[in-house]
Each structure stands twice: as C-alpha cells, then as structure tokens.
Amino acid sequence: MSKLPADSSVPQTGAANGDRDVPQAEVGRGRREPAPAQPEEAGEGAMAAARGGPVPAAREGRMAAARAAPAAAARGAPVAAAALARAAAAGRESPAAAAAREARMAEVARLLGEPVDEEGPEGRPRSRHGNGGLAALPYLRLRHPLSVLGINYQQFLRHYLENYPIAPGRIQELEERRRRFVEACRAREAAFDAEYQRNPHRVDLDILTFTIALTASEVINPLIEELGCDKFINRE
C-alpha cells in the first residue's frame, strides 16, 4: 500500500452524528474553524433577551423599594419620637421653668461671649476686665468655627443647654474658681512687693515656696482627687 501525502485532505461525513452543515477540519496542518451561529439559535437568544427585558427589572425595583421602606421607617422612628418628646416637654413646661431656662441661656451666652480687645501699652491686644471667665480663652470662641460649619450659634447653645443641664452650673463654678485665683494672685503679688521693699534677699525663697504651694493646690490636688488616690493618702 502506498502512503498518502502529508497535506492531503480526507473528507469526512457527519451523517453519523448529525453535523451535516459543519465543515470538518483537514487531517494535515489545518485548524478547525468555529461553526457559524444557526438561525434557530439566534432566534432563541432574541426571545430570551425579550423575556428578560424591562418587566422583570421593574418587578425587582418594586420589590427592592418594598423591602427598603420598613427599614427607612424603622430608622426614622427614633428621631420622630425624640422630636415628639421634646415638643411634649415644651408644652408641659411651666412659665417659671421657661424663664429659668432662658436666664441660664443668657448667663452661658454672657460667659461664652467673645471679649472686646483693646490695644495695650505695648501695642498688643488686651482683653477688658469686664469680659472675664471662659470668654478670655481663645479655644472656646465657638462663633467662627460654627459659622464656617453652617451651624447657628444660638441654636447650638440652646441644644447644648437642653441636653446638658449641668453645664451652666459647671461654668459658673469655673468662673468663681478663676475669680478667687486671680484675687489671691493679686493679693500675694502686693504682699511680695511690700516684703521686697523690707527684705529683698528673702523674696526669692518666698516666690519658690508660693509657686510650689500654688502648683500643689491648683494642679496636683485636683489630679489626685480625680484619680481617686486621695483615699490612700493619710491626711493626718
């Protein structure tokens, strides 16, 4: 038997497996080409795309909206309940309580107000003595940061006083402590000046003693009480 050449093509029939229209690959060096899409398959794909069109998408959208509605209502329920509670509390509030709350708000507004600056003898701004308290502290000036954030200062103050009623008393306590501290410093300074006129050599030791006592009274003792260490210290 003679051998066939390597590039000879042998036609094969696809009658056994039903592939009559699919061209067969060559035996030699050829590649099998993909079969073109049949008209029946193209028609089935178009029908499937038509079935999966806007109707299922609309149905899914309605189902998603129905699922999201109870969750949104559950999230908004606490906010609405809090608003109703505040409105009911405002309705039950007596005129005396309303007047007291307005007085507290006015007092806190006065304490938190910005000081009017003056020019000192050295050309530096100096706060007036009438604007004492927390208003002299620059990091508590809230008006400019709140205005940048778009928050009304009076609304913020009212919300703070309604939710934290202990704040006015705490601010007044800090103001009173600051006033006593300033008065003690001024009295001690006057005493030092008088003592220096009589005995200049002893003033340095008195200054050191006063500094240590002031640090202990204003810093160390409150820190010890805050940490709860005063229970372990023998006061005797």
UniProtKB/Swiss-Prot annotation:
Superkingdom of origin organism: Eukaryota
Amino acid composition bias (Low complexity), ranges on this chain: 38-71
InterPro entries for this protein: EID
Tissue: Most abundantly expressed in placenta. Highly expressed in liver, brain, heart, skeletal muscle, and kidney.
Region (Disordered): 1-71, 112-131
Record key words, sorted: Coiled coil, Developmental protein, Differentiation, Methylation, Myogenesis, Nucleus, Repressor, Transcription, Transcription regulation
GO molecular function: SMAD binding; transcription corepressor activity
Annotated GO biological process: cell differentiation; muscle organ development; negative regulation of DNA-templated transcription; negative regulation of SMAD protein signal transduction; negative regulation of transcription by RNA polymerase II; negative regulation of transforming growth factor beta receptor signaling pathway; regulation of cell population proliferation; transforming growth factor beta receptor complex assembly
Compartments, as annotated in UniProt: Nucleus
Keyword Acetylation: no
Residues with the Omega-N-methylarginine modification: R59, R75
Any one annotated GO CC term: nucleus
Biased composition (Basic and acidic residues): 18-34
Subunit-structure text: Heterodimer with EID2B. Interacts with the C-terminus of EP300. Interacts with HDAC1 and HDAC2. Interacts with SMAD2, SMAD4 and with the MH2 domain of SMAD3.
Role this protein plays: Interacts with EP300 and acts as a repressor of MYOD-dependent transcription and muscle differentiation. Inhibits EP300 histone acetyltransferase activity. Acts as a repressor of TGFB/SMAD transcriptional responses. May act as a repressor of the TGFB/SMAD3-dependent signaling by selectively blocking formation of TGFB-induced SMAD3-SMAD4 complex.
Annotated domain remarks: The N-terminal portion of EID2 is required for nuclear localization.
Entry protein name: EP300-interacting inhibitor of differentiation 2
Protein encoded by which gene: EID2
